[in-house]
Design a protein with these regions (language model features):
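Acidic-basic catalytic patches of nuclease active cores, encompassing PD-(D/E)XK
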Residues: 67-90
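Nucleic-acid nuclease catalytic cores
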Residues: 86-219, 223-226
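Alpha-helical structural motif
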Residues: 41-45, 74, 78, 162, ...
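A generic short-segment signal for beta-strand/edge and adjacent turn/coil regions
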Residues: 59-62, 73-80, 158-160
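Charged, glycine-rich intrinsically disordered N-terminal tails and low-complexity linkers that flank
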Residues: 1-73, 224-256
Length: 256
């Protein structure tokens, strides 16, 4: 069985930023091009904002299995094969998120090597990396892999992840979607975008970040004192979910 333990520090840092995987849900259009209502956008913003309240991530939450683990573990192999056949010149990046203000992006690959082994790279503090190109790897199951291979690159929903990367990296001129499935007749497929190709998406990402920032700091929407009779703020000294899980296991109260 495929199994991978994700870096807990990286998982925790991600909860404080608007990432590529969440920003697509607050865009004015869906992945299929349909208009998204303002009510739906705000409902999705509330879901994303809830992650900003995360104080702790359990050890169990850091364990991935099946397709999720498979996809992560195959990333460096996919990049190596893409470099070999298409001369992309990419380096694998892992367990790091690049951030600026509220926007965050975790690169799979860039045209420069990863020199800092840290979960958080703050562009305002450390300066922006200057890759000429970036890469996003997708090691899907057979059906989704083949659908992606046959989808025109201008319609690939994964392009939004590249757009977030380019919004943060102003000097990046090219982005590559790398689809890899070692069991498929089409083992590897690469879709390359120029910055101009993603110009509209980059602009929409920047606008979505600005809208989310306004939503996040609107006390009328997020003021919990107005919606509850009582509430308690968590602290670092409070017992977390790992504590209770271990307690239940010792007391043989877990049905395992």
């Amino acid at each position: 069985m495929w199994r991978h333990v994700v870096d807990k520090e990286w998982m925790m840092v991600r909860t404080n930023y608007l990432t590529a995987s969440s920003i697509k849900n607050i865009l004015p259009v869906t992945e299929t091009g349909r208009k998204r209502s303002q009510a739906q956008i705000e409902a999705n913003m509330m879901k994303i904002a809830s992650s900003f309240s995360t104080e702790y991530i359990s050890d169990e939450d850091c364990v991935t299995t099946g397709m999720a683990a498979r996809g992560h573990l195959l990333e460096p192999i996919a990049i190596e094969e893409a470099n070999r056949v298409a001369n992309l010149g990419l380096y694998h990046w892992d367990d790091i998120i690049l951030v600026k203000d509220l926007l965050g992006w975790s690169p799979d690959a860039m045209s420069i090597p990863q020199t800092k082994k840290t979960a958080l790279y703050d562009i305002k503090k450390d300066g922006a990396p200057c890759p000429t190109s970036i890469g996003e790897v997708k090691s899907y199951g057979m059906e989704r892999h083949m659908v992606s291979v046959h989808t025109d690159k201008k319609d690939c929903p994964e392009r939004w992840q590249l757009a977030v990367g380019m919004a943060l990296l102003m000097n990046c001129q090219f982005a590559n979607l790398i689809f890899f499935n070692p069991d498929s007749t089409v083992r590897l497929a690469i879709k390359t975008y120029s910055r101009q190709d993603l110009e509209e998406e980059i602009k929409m990402v920047e606008e979505a970040e600005a809208s989310f920032k306004e939503f996040l700091y609107d006390e009328n929407r997020l003021g919990i004192a107005k919606t509850n009779d009582f509430y308690e703020i968590n602290t670092k000294t409070e017992k977390n979910s790992d504590y209770y899980m271990n307690k239940f296991m010792k007391e043989k109260r877990m049905n395992i």
